Curated annotation (Swiss-Prot):
Listed SMART domains: BRCT (SM00292), HhH1 (SM00278), LIGANc (SM00532)
Domain BRCT, residue spans: 609-687
GO biological processes: DNA repair; DNA replication
Entry EC number(s): 6.5.1.2
Protein family: Belongs to the NAD-dependent DNA ligase family. LigA subfamily.
Origin species: Anaeromyxobacter dehalogenans (strain 2CP-1 / ATCC BAA-258)
GO molecular function, one term: DNA binding
Ligand binding (NAD(+)): 34-38, 83-84, 117, 140, 182, 298, 322
Highest taxon, organism lineage: Bacteria
Name this protein carries in UniProt: DNA ligase
Matches recorded under PROSITE patterns: BRCT, DNA_LIGASE_N1, DNA_LIGASE_N2
Reaction equations catalysed: NAD(+) + (deoxyribonucleotide)n-3'-hydroxyl + 5'-phospho-(deoxyribonucleotide)m = (deoxyribonucleotide)n+m + AMP + beta-nicotinamide D-nucleotide
Residues given in the record as Zn(2+) binding sites: 416, 419, 434, 439
Length: 687
């Protein structure tokens, strides 16, 4: 592959992986199947290995994914909570073992001692104990910064679901210890909880991982207390270093302090025993009381671990082996087209229900016509399906040997199944679109996009409430939301609970309506970048919205910018500039924006805090940072009134030197410019 093509492909892969990371770790809504995510990550790793110059400090291959949510206080982990590299074949496990042996300088034939355990599918957390008492707890977040969920962790296990988070340690614990482990829902508790939700007319959770993550990150700890979460410990860290010789001794100590450790943990001498354990667990995985999608292999000797160390993202002494997804055969009942907010018709497959990874599954999407044709999927086909990553239902392939001749290809409708408008597929596009400007399905999708957390954050306004507003003719555009009478909200919340949104409040209709009105009132005060993202302008995602907000500063300048001005914005190309200009000059869109402003929605520019050590100063970044991406560092400096430059001069205030800093560092030294390492830079940001 030519360097230019490799660079473009690497950039595309990084963007897709970052989007998937955000959806999985921050929103708790998986975007990609695990197998697809792993394929993209492996492709990016291979590209960067072949072209080392393409490696960027903020590449997903260089740091743990999952930035902490803005809803909780940020916590800095004393030691980073690194994620694990994953492998999917015997060859890769052999490579891991060989690498460990090579780095340790072990003679041929000397086996490595490992501890192996099931890979739990929950939420990784850290608990801090002082003098045996639980004092604080946080999520892993991005590995360096997590979220403070102390109040919620205090009630994990409060229903007696299993051994939870001890408030006080047993035996003789050290003065301070950090305990790491997984918060999860056992299968029986998950199923019981979902039965209760269904009986109450509420939406059940899709899987135990989403349920555990969503429960632990509730703002109200009482919600967490009502759900049967469990905690399983697998790591302990002492400020002065490990007093234990092996990881196994550490696990025994954790049990002595009162923690639940995994009963399936085993010690193995050499890789052959690891492989035998892997095979046994693969056979038993669906019999276990919790969801698991693989095993974790860890070097047992703690001195060896210290010698092996860690790369920027993964420890060198551990790896996760992931099982291939479970697949089952079933028969397609029908294929139909759903309509999204942009008018795109997506083929949806309904099939006979099958149990996959402990859950009943009966529906999957096929993305577009090309994928359906490539997979050769026909209505009436027998197909193999799986829950890729144990989460997202996916049609893998048809079973043509079981065809009877009655199967038929699916044809996209000529008219929209919702509004009856003409459906078209433009030349060069992969998707069919509804051309109806007033299509109710598109309007519902746009309203949900407008109300989502990353846009105007109208809490409780989901698809079913939006559909109710559209059905009543109450809302025809975003601005109408702010004119919905209180009694209409009451009527919507008076419907049977099974018809309400899963995320909506579960109080009396009047209280729920009051909450919705309050959420709408809060949404009136927003930032320019959130507002621009909420409008759903074609090709304007969060990143582009933020760039436009920073470049233009106020809404009027964005709305009046011509194509040339838009092309002058960083990362906005000709196609995106044309799309933005076309949208802003459409009279109906301008009327909606004017009505939103008249309704009291005030999109304010980002406030620049022109104070502190960076105010009015020029800063240069060089090398990779482990605690944040280069873009994040740049944004933090600019938010404090500083300017980030790409070159060093005598006017440069500070050069921030990360890992593998290059020629800019040498030039700074020659000019006598102040140099700060990452630790000092983070400290300066806090001043």
């Amino acid at each position: 592959m030519k360097k230019a093509d490799a660079s473009a492909r690497a950039r595309e892969l990084r963007d897709r992986i970052r989007a998937a990371d955000h959806a999985y770790y921050v929103l708790d809504q998986p975007l990609l199947a695990d197998a697809e995510y792993d394929r993209l990550m492996h492709e990016l790793q291979a590209l960067e290995a072949e072209h080392p110059e393409l490696v960027t400090a903020d590449s997903p291959t260089q740091r743990v994914s999952g930035a902490p949510s803005e809803r909780f206080e940020r916590v800095v982990h004393r030691e980073p909570m690194l994620s694990l590299g994953n492998v999917q074949s015997d060859d890769e496990l052999h490579e891991f073992d060989a690498r460990v042996r090579r780095l340790l300088g072990l003679p041929d034939g000397e086996p490595v001692g490992y501890v192996v355990e099931p890979k739990l599918d929950g939420l990784a957390v850290e608990l801090v104990y002082r003098d045996g008492a639980f004092t604080s707890g946080s999520t892993r977040g991005d590995g360096v910064n997590g979220e403070d969920v102390t109040a919620n962790l205090r009630v994990v296990g409060g229903l007696g679901a299993n051994r939870g988070v001890p408030h006080a340690l047993e035996g003789r614990p050290p003065p301070r210890v950090e305990v790491r482990g997984e918060v999860l829902l056992f299968k029986e508790h998950f199923e019981a909880m979902n039965r209760q939700l269904v009986r109450a007319g509420e939406e059940p959770f899709a899987n135990p991982r989403n349920a555990a993550a969503g429960t632990l990150r509730q703002l109200d700890w009482r919600v967490t207390a009502r759900r049967p979460l469990s905690f399983i410990a697998y790591e302990a860290l002492l400020p002065g270093g490990d007093p234990w010789r092996t990881h196994w001794e550490k696990l025994e100590e954790l049990a002595a302090w009162g923690f639940e450790t995994n009963a399936e943990n085993r010690r193995c001498r050499g890789l052959a025993e690891v492989l035998a354990y892997r095979d046994r667990m693969a056979e038993r995985r669906f019999e276990l009381p919790y969801d698991t999608d693989g095993i974790v292999v860890k070097v047992d000797d703690l001195d060896w671990r210290r010698r092996l160390g860690a790369a920027s993202k993964f420890p060198r002494w551990a790896v996760a082996f992931k099982y291939p997804p479970q697949e089952e055969a079933t028969r397609i009942r029908r294929i139909w087209a759903s309509v999204g907010r942009t008018g795109v018709l997506t083929p949806v497959v309904d099939f006979d229900p099958v149990r996959l990874s402990g859950a009943m599954v009966a529906r999957a999407t096929l993305h577009n016509e090309d994928e359906m044709r490539r997979k050769d999927i026909l209505e009436g086909d027998w197909v193999l399906v799986r829950r890729a990553g144990e989460v997202i239902p996916e049609v893998v392939k048809p079973l043509p040997e079981r065809r009877t001749g009655a199967e038929q290809p699916f044809r996209f409708p000529a008219e929209c199944p919702v509004c009856g408008a003409r459906v078209v597929r433009e030349e060069g596009e992969k998707v069919y679109r509804c051309t109806g400007a007033a299509c109710p399905a598109q309007l519902v999708g746009r309203l949900c996009h407008f109300a989502q957390r990353r846009a105007l954050d109208i809490e409780g306004l989901g698809e079913k409430l939006a559909a109710g507003l559209v059905e009543r003719g109450q809302v025809k555009d975003f601005a109408d939301l702010y004119a919905v009478p209180f009694e209409v909200w009451q009527q919507l919340f008076s419907r049977p609970r099974k018809e309400q949104d899963a995320g909506a409040a579960r109080e009396l209709p009047e209280k729920s309506a009051q909450n919705m009105v309050a959420a709408l009132e809060r949404s009136r005060k927003t930032t320019l970048r959130r507002f621009l993202f909420a409008l759903g302008i074609p090709q304007v995602g969060e990143a582009t919205a933020a760039t436009l907000a920073r470049h233009f500063g106020d809404l009027a300048r964005v709305m009046d910018a011509d194509e040339e001005a838009l092309k002058g914005v960083r990362d906005v190309g000709p196609e995106t500039a044309a799309e933005i200009r076309a949208w802003t000059q459409e009279p109906q869109n301008r009327r909606v924006v004017e009505r939103l402003l008249a309704a009291g929605v005030t999109p304010e520019a980002e406030v620049v805090e022109a104070r502190g050590p960076f105010a009015g100063k020029t800063v240069v970044l060089t090398g990779g940072l482990s605690t944040m991406s280069r873009d994040d560092a740049k944004a933090e400096i600019e938010r404090r009134g500083g300017k980030v430059s790409g070159s060093v001069s005598r006017k440069t205030y500070l050069v921030v030197a990360g890992e593998d800093a290059g020629s800019k560092l040498e030039k700074a030294r020659s000019l006598g410019v102040r140099i700060a390492g990452e630790e000092e830079f983070v400290r300066l940001l806090k001043e």
